[in-house]
């Protein structure tokens, strides 16, 4: 029986360091991005570091996009599209790479608090592959926004518990 090649043993020290750097970046992303809004904020920060500019700002400044320009458009702080302007006219088509944000979490329902058998419970939806029993052994944090309806503002808030 033929053994499959184990490429792990063939990595150079430089490749192992690069792999370690990428995994640390990924872990940092998972730690920073507990909600869609946090993930979009993180993505915008990284996009700016890579030379992307906000499309709204480009338009408001009356600038023209040129070949190679990088721009992003954010919608309601919950989704983002990033573009790199190509050489050919848009009428020739475009390449699209798409992804979605999936934040494993518990969403607390409206009026979530109830009592049964002398214990207080929170009624919640769970998303992103969580199992009902997984989260009880993990340190929890409340992440989200507070919507202030009379001012049309949303205020990000994080409360670690």
Language model segments and positions:
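N-terminal capping segment at the start of a domain
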Residues: 2-36
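Alpha/propeptide regions of enzymes that mature by internal proteolysis
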Residues: 25-57
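Acidic/His- and Gly-rich active-site-bordering loop/insert found
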Residues: 54, 59-108
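A generic local secondary-structure boundary/capping motif
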Residues: 70-72, 86, 130-135, 145, ...
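Hydrophobic or amphipathic alpha-helical targeting/insertion segments
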Residues: 104-106, 113, 117
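A gly/proline- and charged-residue-enriched helix-loop-helix capping module
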Residues: 119-137
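Short polybasic amphipathic segments
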Residues: 140-147
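Conserved small/polar residues in nucleotide/adenosyl-binding loops
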Residues: 151-157
């Amino acid at each position: 029986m033929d053994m499959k090649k184990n490429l792990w043993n063939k990595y150079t020290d430089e490749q192992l360091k690069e792999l370690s750097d990428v995994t640390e970046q990924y872990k940092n992303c998972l730690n920073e991005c507990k909600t869609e809004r946090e993930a979009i904020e993180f993505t915008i920060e990284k996009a700016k570091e890579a030379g992307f500019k906000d499309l709204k700002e480009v338009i408001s400044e009356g600038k023209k996009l040129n070949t190679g320009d990088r721009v992003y458009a954010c919608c309601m702080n919950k989704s983002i599209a990033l573009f790199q302007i190509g050489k050919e006219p848009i009428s020739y088509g475009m390449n699209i790479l798409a992804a979605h944000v999936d934040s494993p979490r518990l969403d607390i329902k409206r009026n979530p608090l109830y009592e049964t058998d002398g214990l207080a419970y929170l009624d919640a939806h769970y998303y992103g592959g969580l199992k009902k029993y997984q989260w009880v052994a993990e340190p929890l944090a409340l992440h989200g926004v507070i919507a202030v309806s009379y001012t049309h503002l949303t205020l990000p808030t994080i409360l670690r518990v």
